[in-house]
Amino acid sequence: MVHARRHETRKNSKTQVPEQKSRVDWRRTKRSVSQLFDSDEELDSDEEIGSDEDLDGGESIDSDGKLDISKDSGINEIPEKETELNLIKVESERSNSKCHMNTSSSSADEEEMNKTKHNDLPDDEAHPGQAEGHHNKLTGQVLEEDVEDECIKPGKRKRLSSVMYDSDESDDSDILVRKASAKHPRRVVEDECSSLEMERETPEKSPAARKREYHQKLQELCERSRQKQRHNSGRNCESSEKDSCSSTDEDEDDDDYGDAENEDDYMIDDFVVGDEEADEENKNQGENLTTSQLKLVKQNSLYSFSDHYTHFERVVKALLINAFDGSFLETLYAGKRKKSYAQDMLTSLHYLDDRFIQPRLESLVSRSRWREQYKERVESYSDLSIHWKSPENCGCQACGLHRYCKFSVRLSGKLYNTRTMETDDFMSRDKQVFIVGRICAERTKIYHKLKHFKFKLYQDCCSIAYTKEVGDEQVKDTVKRLFCQLKKSGWIRKKHGQLEEYLNSADYFQDEKFKL
């Protein structure tokens, strides 16, 4: 009865073990472990009670000798009791060890414990001598694995840029750990170094900058002095040619010039002089401008800041004066005229020849294959007439190329001087005829108009001067009156428009790209 009851109790205790839960659900795992502890405690209490009864019953049977047991049955009962005692000891040790274990142990260890519980009973009954050692090994492994799990702690991420103490992470260590980034001290050191370098470089660069500023200001002063000298030299020339000049104006000019020199000296004194010799050389360069250099500057059209129409008006006025006084242009180009208005006219004449007409003529010739003889003929004769004729398959007399020539070019007129506009009566009735192609005829027309434009303009001025009544008035007054009339009537503007048209036609002329 006792054995059957004990067997039923162990069997019931097995069935009360809950099923294994998933390893992911930690709450269910903890709950199953707690239930397992309760069932093991009940089982231990029942087994202790049963073992006491078995011991009492065995003693009574042995002492009284009331029961007759065979040898075989006695042999079988002894090992059963021994195994039961061993199981009770092992389970009591297991319960004590589990009570001290952490409830947060891994589910894998609990599965191994459950498997050993299910497999322990038949193994113990078949091999009673090995049960105790086997259970001791299992409990030792479980304890070691639990201790290892308790010691393992996940690491914490620490910021590099922050400065903190690590006393909270480890209770045992009292060492203060400083963790700081190296960017901030570098940044401060670089700033200090850069500031020191800048302070060192600034005194080194300051003398060079001062020298540059000093030379720039000296150049400006030289330019101012040159302009003033030009202005004063022009005034002096005009005053020398005039019959009478007021002394008050001269005094004012002298005062102004003296004040300007004083201002220049005052500005130069404020400079930090590095080399006195260089300063003297710069001053001498500004003061040693001769009249010949000033003449070249005025004659050069690059130094003229007037517009095209202003230059053209001066040219018309110069041609009008030469129409009344034939020696004006000759003396002007010879440098005998020193007045400012005469120098302005000379500058405008150079500007018309060197800047307006000559570059276009060179461009037209450079893009053609004209013979030198044909070019000289076109430049020498002032009159041109182009006529259409029946085409001939022959060589062009202008460029020498073989093509269909259907234009006849006739050159005539007197030879003249391009500067003084004086004509030459030698072979005045001579004529030249050339048979050319279409492209050469167009090029000849444009080239001749530009080359002889100033001479044609002079002829028009002469015709106007001859038709107008002069009377007893002076040449200067007559030229002024005629110039005002031509300007009001729009004649000067019209001639300027013709010049612009010729210049544009020369710029946009297409050479031998046209098909015949």
UniProtKB/Swiss-Prot annotation:
InterPro entries named in the record: CCDC82 (IPR025244), DUF4211 (IPR025451)
Region (Disordered), start-end ranges: 1-265
Sections of the chain in a coiled coil: 204-232
Residue positions where Phosphothreonine is found in the record: 202
Basic and acidic residues: bias regions: 78-96, 113-135, 215-226
Biased composition (Acidic residues): 38-62, 248-265
Keyword terms, alphabetized: Coiled coil, Phosphoprotein
Protein's UniProt name: Coiled-coil domain-containing protein 82
Gene: Ccdc82
